[in-house]
């Protein structure tokens, strides 16, 4: 059994301003995405400029933050949102949803593609390899905050988290760091290193993230305000990941069936 290391969630202070590790992880994620995008843009076959990369990161960040927060309120805290809609803007209280962020990024990349006269599917194929390392950084932020812990376990690496009772739990944030962050990055970066059929990279991302998240949810404690949403075992995260698996699998088949490259 391991004990949570009790990391101070505040990274440093600038006078009265507290800079939290979780916020820094978002900055790290965006910085890594920007760097990877600039690296990929150096390939003349991809037809991207540094200016377009900078604009894309801005659009992506906007969609992620707005969609992530709105998605959390709608998917995970709807009753509180209806009772007090202003909680949407209380971001300091925490609460971000990957699936909401995904929808937000879909919308903003579509707007970006319209303004730059690029095909939306080409834009998403360029974007998705940049995402997993940002997800990895976010899960490290969750771990530092001591939140989103796992279910009670007897495995040797079970960890006692503050505010989660005396029993050891799966460090599910680290499982998601490895699955949705490291492993997903390796798979998507390798797959996207060569030009693939249009939307194949995006489809594989949807499929793999959905599978990895669905698996990780078996070790993660369900949100207390929701519990299991169906069958006595299905969580909201699994419910939202199922469409990703189905759509991703079908879209990957479609991409290779209708090759445009």
From Swiss-Prot:
Gene Ontology biological process terms in this record: lipoprotein biosynthetic process
Keywords linked to the UniProt accession: Cell inner membrane, Cell membrane, Membrane, Transferase, Transmembrane, Transmembrane helix
Transport recorded as keyword: no
Membrane topology of this protein: Multi-pass membrane protein
EC number in record: 2.5.1.145
GO cellular component annotations of the record: plasma membrane
InterPro entries (UniProt xref): Lgt
Stretches assigned to coiled coil: none
EC category: transferase
Entry's transmembrane regions: 19-39, 56-76, 92-112, 126-146, 173-193, 199-219, 227-247
GO molecular function: phosphatidylglycerol-prolipoprotein diacylglyceryl transferase activity
Keyword Transferase: yes
Pfam families cross-referenced by the UniProt entry: LGT
Binding site for a 1,2-diacyl-sn-glycero-3-phospho-(1'-sn-glycerol): 139
Principal subcellular localization: membrane
Location in or out of the cell: Cell inner membrane
Homology family: Belongs to the Lgt family.
Protein role: Catalyzes the transfer of the diacylglyceryl group from phosphatidylglycerol to the sulfhydryl group of the N-terminal cysteine of a prolipoprotein, the first step in the formation of mature lipoproteins.
NCBIfam families: lgt
Name recorded for this polypeptide: Phosphatidylglycerol--prolipoprotein diacylglyceryl transferase
Organism: Coxiella burnetii (strain RSA 493 / Nine Mile phase I)
């Amino acid at each position: 059994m391991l004990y949570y290391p009790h990391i101070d969630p505040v990274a440093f202070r600038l006078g009265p301003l507290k800079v939290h590790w979780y916020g820094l992880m978002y900055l790290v994620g965006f910085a890594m995405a920007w760097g990877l995008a600039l690296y990929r843009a150096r390939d003349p076959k991809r037809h991207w400029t540094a200016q377009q990369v900078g604009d894309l990161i801005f659009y992506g960040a906007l969609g992620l933050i707005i969609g992530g927060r709105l998605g959390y309120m709608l998917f995970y805290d709807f009753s509180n949102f209806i009772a007090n809609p202003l909680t949407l803007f209380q971001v300091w209280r925490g609460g971000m949803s990957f699936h909401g962020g995904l929808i937000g990024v879909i919308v903003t990349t579509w707007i970006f593609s319209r303004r730059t006269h690029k095909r939306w599917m080409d834009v998403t194929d360029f974007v998705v390899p940049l995402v997993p390392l940002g997800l990895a950084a976010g899960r490290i932020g969750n771990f530092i905050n001591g939140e989103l812990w796992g279910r009670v376990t007897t495995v040797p690496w079970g960890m006692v988290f503050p505010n989660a009772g005396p029993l050891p739990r799966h460090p599910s944030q680290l499982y998601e760091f490895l699955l949705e962050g490291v492993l997903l990055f390796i798979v998507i970066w390798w797959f996207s290193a060569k030009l693939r059929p249009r939307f194949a990279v995006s489809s594989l991302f949807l499929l793999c993230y959905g599978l990895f998240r669905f698996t990780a949810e078996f070790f993660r404690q369900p949100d207390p305000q929701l519990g299991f949403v169906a069958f006595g075992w299905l969580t909201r995260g699994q419910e939202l990941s199922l469409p990703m698996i189905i759509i991703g699998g079908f879209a990957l088949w479609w991409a290779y069936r209708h090759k445009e490259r």
